[in-house]
Amino acid sequence: MLKIDSLRIRYGNVEAVKGISLEVQHREIVALLGANGAGKSSTLRGVMNLSPKFGGKVFLRGEDISRLDTSEIVRKGCCLVPEGRKIFPYFTVEENLMMGDYGNSKGKTRQTKANLERVFSLFPILAERKRQLGGTLSGGEQQMLAIGRSLMLEPDIIMMDEPSLGLAPILVEQIFALIQEIRDKLNRTILLVEQNAHMALQIADRGYILETGRIVLSGTARELRENPDVAKAYLGMA
């Protein structure tokens, strides 16, 4: 589905991503883990052509998308749920969701309505609050809104950047359960950047560990959970 080959990203003289390669297969949940500053968010932004790549390539279903505009990448089926949610606070919930459909081809009103109903089915709380301003929602509800917005164009792969950031523990569990549901019921593929390694590895099929811009370890979620170095560094186990 998604293949990153020797990706390099630089901000000025600082090389944030140093030639990483990874793959995400159809209907997989793949976790990209690491400390702050490891290059996780830069990797996702690089896929979307939002960060300055100076080396490597990105392939979506075998097609080289490295030089495409962000809008073209989205239309080809790859979406990003950004860190911090980035909703429109003065738009209603429904208007925020419709922004996810912005740029869709004319004449797809029926499909747009179906997509909206699908999102409301997945997130009933958003249906209840569809006339409410996005900025008045709780943190968990805003995260649901950001994820729902990404679903409006029916992407094949969704990249999520720190979806549990700043949420209460009970909401974290809800968000991760919803991520699983999106994969299982909607057949979506997910690349998940997350500092909550424990929860991420509970739902992921595979994972990669990123340190200072390089992948230092990869394996199945079970292999990473049982790795003593990973347990000590990321799972809080001595």
Each model region followed by its residue ranges:
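Glycine-rich phosphate-binding loops of nucleotide-dependent enzymes
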Residues: 1-238
